[in-house]
Amino acid sequence: DTGHQTYVHKLLTGRNSEFDGLRQPGEISGYPSRAESSHDWIENSHASTVLAYAHGLATADATRGGSRRVVAVIGDGSMTGGMAFEGLNNLGHSGLKVTIVLNDNGRSYAPTVGRLSESLIRIRSNPTYMRRQRRLEDIAESLPWVGELLERSISATKAALRDMFEPTAFFEALGVHYLGPFDGHDIAEIEDALRNAAEFDGPVVVHLLTQTVRGHVPAE
């Protein structure tokens, strides 16, 4: 979602040598462009459009008898837009295989409003939840004889805690499964979450908590 955030995608799909000409006449676009690369499946500029694109791509694949899972990445600010809500509603109704990666970093050009935004803020502003989750997992790994049993117990506890947060009810009411929140800076955890999401037949939200430009102290 939000096409001007496509720069890293362009760098990873063979256009790094052309980057000096970004947004210049006759050079590469600052947005996804299907005419520019076969890796650009959609063309969008500003926010809340990607779920509609995902619905269209998944519908086209299913119509042709395919079984591919479409993955859409959207920020918490864009998720509060009306078009995103419409896309969620359509995906939940259709039951299509779409994974929605919700990149929740608390950033948008203007303050977000509404119940979903308030719920995401409450989770993001409660670092204790993530710290306690990590501490329990570390303890489980350090106890070889009870580790497996404790890990199963922790997984059940984490699921119960997540069900207490409003986003779960919001997405599930629309027919979209919800997984999370997860540490968006833990690659192994993200990979596990995406593998789990792929096991569902219908649409799934994978909620990642991230910090913009993390690791670059002057920008943090």
Model-identified regions with their sequence ranges:
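Structural beta-sheet core signal
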Residues: 56, 72-73, 100-102, 206-208
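Broad gene-expression machinery/nucleic-acid interaction feature
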Residues: 69, 97, 203
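Asparagine-centered polar/low-complexity signal
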Residues: 89-90, 103-105
